[in-house]
């Protein structure tokens, strides 16, 4: 990908990067491990973004 990105695309990629994380530990503890992983996790090679 090009180094020089439009600002809108850069912001969308940053938002996707931030949302691609596990839930916090306190959520797992509070729900007694009922919630252990995020349904919206994305692997960089398997699923591509439409950004």
Curated annotation (Swiss-Prot):
Signal peptide (UniProt feature, chain positions): none
Q: Name one Pfam family in it.
A: Ribosomal_L39
Q: Which UniProt keywords apply?
A: Ribonucleoprotein, Ribosomal protein
A GO BP term, please? translation
InterPro entries, alphabetically? Answer: Ribosomal_eL39, Ribosomal_eL39_CS, Ribosomal_eL39_dom_sf
Is this entry keyworded Ribonucleoprotein?
yes
For this chain, the family text in UniProt reads: Belongs to the eukaryotic ribosomal protein eL39 family.
HAMAP family named among the record's database cross-references: Ribosomal_eL39
Q: What is this protein called?
A: Large ribosomal subunit protein eL39
At the highest ranks, the source species' classification is: Archaea, Thermoproteota, Thermoprotei, Thermoproteales, Thermoproteaceae
């Amino acid at each position: 990908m090009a180094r020089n990105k439009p600002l809108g695309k850069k912001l969308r990629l940053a938002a996707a990067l931030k949302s691609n994380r596990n839930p916090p530990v306190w959520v797992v503890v509070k729900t007694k491990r009922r919630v252990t992983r995020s349904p919206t996790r994305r692997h960089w090679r398997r699923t591509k973004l439409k950004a």
